[in-house]
UniProtKB/Swiss-Prot annotation:
Protein name, entry field: Chaperonin GroEL
Keywords assigned by UniProt, alphabetized: ATP-binding, Chaperone, Cytoplasm, Isomerase, Nucleotide-binding
InterPro entries: Chaperonin_Cpn60_CS, Cpn60/GroEL, Cpn60/GroEL/TCP-1, GroEL-like_apical_dom_sf, GROEL-like_equatorial_sf, TCP-1-like_intermed_sf
Subunit structure: Forms a cylinder of 14 subunits composed of two heptameric rings stacked back-to-back. Interacts with the co-chaperonin GroES.
Family: Belongs to the chaperonin (HSP60) family.
UniProt cross-references to Pfam families, sorted A to Z: Cpn60_TCP1
PROSITE patterns membership: CHAPERONINS_CPN60
Localization annotation: Cytoplasm
Provenance organism: Thermoanaerobacter pseudethanolicus (strain ATCC 33223 / 39E)
Catalytic activity annotation: ATP + H2O + a folded polypeptide = ADP + phosphate + an unfolded polypeptide
UniProt-listed Enzyme Commission number(s): 5.6.1.7
Keyword Isomerase in record: yes
GO biological process: protein refolding
Signal peptide: none
Amino acid sequence: MAKQIKYGEEARRALERGVNAVADTVKVTLGPRGRNVVLDKKYGSPTVTNDGVTIAREIELEDPFENQGAQLLKEVATKTNDVAGDGTTTATLLAQAMVREGLKNLAAGANPMLLRRGIAKAVDAAVEGLKRISKPIDNKESIAHVASISAADEEIGNLIAEAMDKVGKDGVITVEESKTLGTTLEVVEGMQFDRGYISPYMVTDAEKMEAVLEEPVILITDKKLSNIQDLLPLLEQVVQHGKKLLIIADDVEGEALATLVVNKLRGTFTCVAVKAPGFGDRRKEMLQDIAILTGGQVISEELGYDLKDVRLDMLGRARQVKVTKENTTIVGGAGDAAEIKKRVNQIKAQIEETTSDYDREKLQERLAKLAGGVAVIQAGAATETELKEKKHRIEDALAATKAAVEEGIVPGGGIALLNVIEDVQKVVDSLDGDFKTGAKIVLRALEEPVRQIAANAGVDGSVIVEKIKAAKDPNFGYDAYKEEFTDMFKAGIVDPTKVTRTALQNAASIASMILTTEAVVVDVPEKNTAMPNPGAGMDMM
């Protein structure tokens, strides 16, 4: 396919137009008085959102050169979202500011490679400054503040803080769509997996259609059970000791299933059978997790165990097991705390090493099931459009809160970036020539978020920036919601350090790429040839 090429200033200006198209659309959403953007959907209702990355992903430009700039800026938003889960609008805005300032200097004859090194040096200083002013987050109130700021909703903030309080920082918190108008929190204690009873005849509560076993023993095996002879020695021990039995197996069918059901109906013993969770190697790992949590052993021929030789002390134990048609929940597993901790650390190490997002998500789920539990936030709203928007906000707030727990918090409202100007200024003073000019580009960009938050609130950004700088108080800032100057920490206006840091680093990375670009190559658009008119005698469809 033929290509079009643009060089030098012409290429960079085309990229800048693409950058501006994305940034100008995204930046109107910044701050508590930021506006929404309506996204057209081919099918169904339009999406109304103020989430930077969602908006950026929707933008495709007609001009192929400008579109390259737009795609590069999308990369800033997407990468920031992947790493920190929030701060995509800030990242987009910072990148736009750096590109704008950088291109001015290039037009005046600056060396792009020296500018790039200057930008990198200044960003390193700013990141160190952010670490210096960051405060650890350790109480429910601080978590609620972070979540409330991100979601722009106090109720959601409190729900997220409560969810984190219940399941711990390693716990899994998921967001689902509710059928009701309100937004609620549901917490599942213990380990839950998405497999229900194999036969409905195994329920202990016919009204609720669920089986609840108090103090049961748990057989964990990767075998398919169809022959009752394999199970008889174990069942005799279970009946002798008057225990209730939960069987977690690859499958239970045929004669084995029929015998278990008949004995349950006769009242000989209480038994519930469920299929093992997961698939393939993940299934083996999850069975091992359940075994460690309940203090049992996985009965597997690979490990040299035969079902006929199973003793009662090889089975897992728990305070309670609840089995519904779709889920099994094990509460109060009798596993050794040290062994569970060892397993948790092993999974954490795997999370660090994996490069697959899917694997990471599955490992996080396993970690949560071992470490604490699962919380589900049910998002409710009056219309489908509002529901989508609310779910987006909750997911963003959740990601921001996790980032805050990880690396701490800094004053919000763009103030943290103003606070590190002194750190960057020291670097600027130590440099000269185009190296210095590159560092100055970052210096100017650091003011941009405060200016934009103020502009979205309808006030002059430059005046606000100068007032904050003159105050010399690191926590002094502008509350755009109440339209007043205040102590940001006391007012609960905080941002996660990780979000601010990631936004700045990713913005600088893409800006440097654009500034050092000397040519852009794109495909020549194909000409759509119009279909010929149907000839005489042809039927019109």
